[in-house]
Structure formats: C-alpha cells, structure tokens
Amino acid sequence: AANINIGKEREYGIGMFFFPNDELRLRQAKKMFEIIVEKEGMTFLGWREVPTTPTVLGKKALECMPKILQGFVAKPADVEKGLDFDRKLYIARKVFEQSNEESYVVSLSSRTIVYKGMFLVGQLRLFYNDLQDKDYESAIALVHSRFSTNTVPSWEKAHPYRYIVHNGEINTIRGNADKMLAREENMESDYLKDEMIKLTPVVDPNGSDSARLDNTLEFLLMSGMPLPLAMMITIPEPWENNEGMSREKRDFYQYYATMMEPWDGPASILFTDGDIMGAVLDRNGLRPSRYYITDDDQLILSSEVGVLDFDTTHIVKKERLHPGKMLLVDTVKGELIDDEILKDSYVKNQPYGEWLSDNLVFLKDLKIPNVAVEEYSYEESNRLMKAFGYSYEEVKDSVLPMALNGSEAIGAMGVDTPLAVLSKRHHPLFDYFKQLFAQVTNPPIDAIREEIVTSTSIYVGGEGNVLEEKAENCHVLKIHNPILTNTDLLKIRYAKVKNINVKDVPITYYKGTPLDKAINHLYVAVDQAHKNGANVVILTDRGVDENHVAIPSLLAVSAVHHHLIETKKSTSVSIILESGEPREVHHFATLLGYGACAINPYLAQFSIKKLIQDGLLKKDYYAAVNDYNNAVLHGIVKIASKMGISTLQSYQGSQIFEAVGISKKVIDEYFTNTVSRVEGITIEDIAEDVDYHHSKAFDMLGLKNDLSLDSEGDHKYRSGKEEHLYNPLTIHTLQTAAWTNNYELFKQYTSMINKETSPVSLRGLMDFNYPSKGVPIEEVESVDSIVKRFKTGAMSYGSISKEAHETLAIAMNMIHGKSNTGEGGEDLERLTVGPDGLNKCSAIKQVASGRFGVTSRYLVSAQEIQIKMAQGAKPGEGGHLPAGKVYPWIAKTRHSTPGVGLISPPPHHDIYSIEDLAQLIYDLKNANRNARISVKLVSEAGVGTVAAGVAKAGAQVILISGHDGGTGAAPRNSSIHNAGLPWELGLAETHQTLIMNGLRNK
C-alpha cells in the first residue's frame, strides 16, 4: 500500500470491501473488480489490507469477520472531480455487485469512506487502527450505534450505509422497494443515459429497509437530483392537512407525491455526500434528534444529549429537529442552512402550482356520465351474496353498524374459532391473512389525534419520470377515499381526461376452467389493455351467473399486481377493483395492501339498500353508503396506523400481512414475498371454495335454492356451524365443576377442551413425542411446585368487575401462583392483607402506555412488573372504556376523571424504540429492585428478533401473547379476528432466536 501513488485530493476513489476469507474466492473477487474498473474507463491503482485488531471483537463477530481490504481507483482526466467521478465509481460498483454476490462493497467514493462492522460503537476505533491515527482528519463524521432489533446482526447490515445512517424503521419498505423496481422501466436520466441498464436492480432485494432507502437516495443523486431534494421527496413532511404551510411548498410536495410515495415509518436520518451533511426527521417526529452549535463552528447532532464530552460554555445554540424538518451543513460554502431556507430553494425551482392546475385531476371534478348504474332485484342480490360467500353475521354485525353509525362494530372477549385453514367452513381468502403491527422498535400512531400527519389520498394513472421535472408528470387522478361509490366508478370509467385511459378487465371465468389457467388469461388481458394504451385497469367481477364464477378478488388483485411488478409495469398501470366480494374492513385493507388503488364494493353497498328495504336501517341510502365507505376508510387508516404508517399511498402495495395456511406455491406465484410459515390450501382448494359458494347460489340441476344467508356462528355459537372452543357444553361443565367442587366433572371439561382444540389451533395438530420409557412418578416435580408457576392473564379492573378481579388474586395467592392486575391499576386497600386473612394483592403489576394506577406503592408491592407493549386481541391499539363505565371507583384506581372515556392503552408515543424500553426497564428496576421485569409482546413474524432486543434491554421475562387473546373492547372484525398470529409461532420463533443469540439462559 505504501507504494501506491494515489495522487492529489479527490483525484482518486477509495473502496472499502468485505471479501470472503477463502484465498481462491478472494483472488477471483479482486481480479473481477480490477477488470471492471478498467472496462469502465478508469485506472485501478492497488489494494491495501486494512489494519485491524480482531481481538476486540465478540465471539460471533469474529466467527463471521470478512477479509477487509481497500481498493484505490484513479480519476480519468476527462472526468470532473466530485459527483461526476463518484458517478463513474457508482457504475463500476453496481456492475461488480451483479457479478460477485459473495463480496460486499462497503463504500466506493472519492469523497467519503465508511468504516463499520459487527460490534459496538466503543469498539470501532479499537478495531480499525486507521481511526487511532491522529493525522486522520475529516470535516464530517457520521457515527451510528444500534440494537439491531428488526434484522439479525451482520457485518454487511451494520450502519453507516454509503450515504445515510438511519435510526428507525421504514415500515412500508416492501411496497417502496416493489415500486422502485417498477420505476426502472420509465426512469430516464441525462446523466446516466445508456448506463442505466447497468444499474438495475436499483434496490438490493436482500437489503434491509435502511439499505434499500440508501440505494434509492444514491440512485436519485447519481441521476442528477440533489441529495436534499431526494430526501424531501422520500421522507416528505406532512403537507396535505397543514394549512399553515405556504401554497408553493404544498404544490411542490403535491407534484412529487404523484410520482413517489413516502417511505413511511419512524426515522431520524443523517445523510452526506462528503460535501454536505444533513439530517431529517420523519413526518411524525418519532425519533429524537438534538443538536448543539459551538462557537468554533462545530455542529453536534445526536439522538441523545451528552454523547460527546466537551466544554458546554462553547455552546451558542441548542435545538432539536422537528417532525418532517431538515437541517443542512454545506462544508464547501461553510454554511448552516435551516429547513425553511433550504426547502425554499427547491420549491421555487419550477411553476409546480401551474403544472398541477393544468394537469392534476380530482375525482370530485369529473363529470357524472349519463349511464345508469347496474341494479339488482331482491332475489338477484341474494343470489350474488350467496355466490360471494356472505353470511348473515357479516351483513348484520359488520355492514349494518358501519352504515348506521359510520364506524366499525366493537366486540369483546377473544377468538375461540378455528384458523381459516383448520375450519370446516369455506372461508374467504381474506381470512388467511393476518395483519402485522408495530411493537417496541417503533410505536403505533393515534390516527385520530394525529390527523395532521395522516393522508388517505391515492393517485391513479401512469406515473411520470421522477428524474425529470416536467408538467405532464403530474397528469394523474387524485382520489381522497379509495372506497368508491358506484357513481365514483362510473365517473372514472367514462372519464374524458387526457392521459387517463381506462379499460375494464373481467375477473370472471367459465365454471370448470382451472383457476390457474383463468389467472393466466387475466395476465394476457391486462397486458393487452396496457399495450392498447390503458394506464388504469378496472378488474371487475360483475357478470357472475350460473355459468361464470369470479376469481377471488384478493387473488386477482395480488396476482395482477405482482405480474405488473415482474414485467415492470406497476407504475404505468393502476388497478381499480369492482367486486361484490369485499364487505369487511379487513377485506379492503388486504386489497389495498396487495396493490389495489381503489375498490368499488358494489354488492356490499347494495346490501345496504336491502337493509333499508327490510326495515333494519332507517336512513337515506346515499347517506348510509357514505357512512359505510367512511367507516371502512377509518378502519383502514387505523390498521395502517397500528404499523406506524400515516399515508395510504405508502400502505398501498406494502403487503404488511402474514399468510397462515396457504401453500408455498400459491404464495410464491401470486403473493410474492409475503411472510408465510404455515402451509395449507392450494390453488385447487381455493377454486373448490369458489365453486362451493357458487353452487349454493346457482343450482346446476335447476332446483330452487334457499337464497337466505346462512348464520355461520362466527361471533356467537350456532349448532352445526363454526366450531367454538368455548361452547355451551364446555362452559356449563366448567361452571358446574367449579360450583360443586367436582374434580371428575372438571376432568370431563379438560377432556372436552383438549378434544375441541384439535380443529381450532395449531397446538391441536401436535402430539407429544413420548419416550419408550417414562420417569417414575416420585421423580416428577410436585403439584405444589408446579402451580407456583401458574399466572393469570392480565385483565384490568374496569374490564372485569371488582369481585372477579379480587377472586383471581386471592386464588392465585393461595396456591402461590401469580395474578396480573392488567393495566387498570389496583385499589390501595388490596396491597395489604385484609382482616379476613385473604391476600387480594396481585403479584404481577402491569405498566402500560397510559400508566393507569401506577404509583410508587403500586410498583413496590409487585413480585413482577410487566410492561405491556401489545395485546393479542388488539395489537397496536387500545380498547375503548366508555365514559359511562368510568365510575368514580374505577377513575380513582386509574387516577383518571370519572365519566371521561379512556382509550386503554392509549397509542401515544410511550415507547419510541428499544432504547426507550431499556430506559423504562432501568427505571422500574430502580423503583423495585426485587421485582422481575417482564415485557408482553404479541406473536407476529419477526417477534423473535424483537424479543432478542428486549432481552438485551434487561427484561428477565418475555411473554408472547397470541391472536386469540381476550379484550374488553376492540373492532370485532379488523382487530379481534384478523390482527396478530398464533402464539405457537411466536413462542417457537422467540425461543429459537434467543438461543441463536446466546440469550435464552438470561
């Protein structure tokens, strides 16, 4: 390395490489890079082995430590210093990455160099000897330390990335990445021109959320977009409902919103290209970013105050970044540029307002065509509802409350019915998908009280070229509510608007045709529509009759969406669904999540007319439909907010679901990249379900069918219908056994439950693998010892009565088990043993975001303190304790106001991150050093990695709650039945992840 003549400053580029340790593969990778550099018109100067001290590493980091080398590249004489040279290096790096997947290019630039690894920040300087050299100076330093709670740690996924460090999570990353893939087809840059083909895929499909955002920002920068502008359009501030924002700035954000959806989620992002350094905060401000400016022109920004020791008398300014705001330092000009001045320089670049006025089309402004809406007779509508699998409960308990009250029906208790894949019923495909949600690593959002940052707008039509600013880019249709009335759909279908070309594509097929063939025909029809100039396709299942059945709407939408992604057309063609199938909030959420831009639920809306005709709904039809649509929209926003997502534009196509009980072949083919750990139904099974419902509506023998809707027993037990774990017989047997103290009767109850478990849950499919020889009974742990580990579920005072709450505590104390207060606090008089000698004090005291009833006495009386991060029945949201139930004695215990309703727990920003949880654990341990600290999580994909972070944060107990947990109040269908995963999956994942990380014995 000492013999390499690298030339003057910025006349050379430095690459930092993680290479394989195998000598042969190392030589091959190095040679490959040298050839590519020369082929791209540059001169390779030589290699340098980076001096390191591996002894400072931990065991796991040392085991997978790569070979770390630096490569030097000379700038060609005909290339300008700075960005132009970095662009050449970027192209060379992308070509190398595509030809060598075993190596990782940490950085390759003439302006920046990245040192990183799988270790703590305190080990950075000790590991890299370069950083101990006092002559090593830089005007800019970005340093990042993280818990690594949403990805498994590795050398490659450590921060910093090439242009950013990111504290937070991009919750919409699946949709963002898919859309960037599709944009490759229509993005053109004067700076990259024919080189563009070498740069795809722009986004690394195997990268983390931060890595893929870094890929996108780097590509935009290399395509000619200034880095601050790229940050503004990927992480925009909340502008749509901000009346205090200038018209020019709102026009700017509106223009770019037509081409780039927000990369949504909690984020404090620092960025640099070597000349400028900046920081931006997400639209909700869900990550702290504080900074000092000193009298010697230093800017120190960090998530915490006090990360560096220095004389505070030199501080001339203390400030923090505000939600959506940006700060920039230009080291070339020696300027600190604040948010307003920085953004002003971009929002006035073009006449965005004029462009929008001339091109952006609003749904409300489209003319209503002189075309009649297709209507159905009473009998026809019943027949179609049977064909689409409607049940009596869905209409009465879901559609009716939404049309009547404008909000989703509230339910209580938990779920004791089978998973869709285990049910004997023919469930709609929607029921096989479970909603994911935020816990610990980022907070859910209160969509009602944070309305200013929430946007429901969706854009329909072909997307413009984000790399070129021009008026026609924003020639799209803007829809404020993606749930369309029949009139809305007619306006779109017959729109006489330039650049909005609409084509109907049927999703019905002749009964008897294999479903996979019908989907292939659908692909051909969509491709033909696009070839003929359509940039909006309406997938419609109107046309179901005795000979034609409909492809399940979710399957049709997702299949077409992924087909368009694969053929790089998804930003050129928008999908609108006209379907009789969706009727519940969860149905619409999955359709949006898998690619639909808007949905017209024509049959659900017609069922409202039937409710009015039957006298069950006394309301104007159009008002009722409007309330139903708004209720659905509100429900979707709430589902998105549980994941920390503020905009439906970002939620659309983000696939934030886990499939339970669908075969891998179906997932890979039609729901690509969906998390799925339990296989099940095939494409033939799905077709069988479709045919079953169709045959109930259309009898091929010509017999008269019963067209009344079946009561399936989803919410209440119905004999001969859906199985329930707790049915009248099991409940009666348990109650009688308890009342009569009859152990034999109790054994009958447990036998019934174990027998009933089989068709209901995953654990019912398992059996014990008994050894050939058992253990003598005298060697088995005693009953008295076993029951000490019994704990009741957390049920708050207020959700259940005082008598029930106290009885549970007394019973558990008598057997030396532990009862749990729930989040509602506990009466002071219960903290001491009463004169009757009964101990009513719950051993486990729960602490949730509302801190209801949490006092010093409450905490010191605990044997275990449980931090409630989420609840199985309603993860990411709180139940509603109505004002009428907040009695004076409830309010006293909770330290709230009588007669004022409570959201329990409130989704405010109590825990922003794993660091916040670590702080709370520390504080609670100081309040009661004898109590064990427990953290309650809910089962979902990735909970094991979160649990590993929780263990690192100091928790001694981790509770995994399942989707079937109980609640006092939550949306019946969207939350109780469709959020969260079985605890069996979460428990297994958590156990395995803790073992893998050496944390299980802690």
Question: Which residues are covered by each model-predicted region?
Answer:
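Short, flexible, solvent-exposed loop/turn segments with mixed acidic/basic and small polar residues
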Residues: 2-9, 783-786, 923
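Glycine-rich phosphate/ribose-binding loops and adjacent secondary-structure elements
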Residues: 95-100, 104-106, 121-128, 143-197, ...
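Hydrophobic/aromatic-rich, well-ordered segments within soluble, folded domains that form packed cores
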Residues: 170-173, 321, 326-332, 804-817, ...
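Mobile "lid/hinge" segments at catalytic clefts and subdomain interfaces of large enzymes
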Residues: 177-210, 295-306, 312-330, 595, ...
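Flexible, glycine-rich loop/tail regions that form catalytic "lids" or insertion modules at the edges
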Residues: 220-267, 271-275, 303-307, 340-516, ...
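Active-site beta->alpha loop and helix N-cap motifs at the rims of alpha/beta catalytic domains
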Residues: 902-908
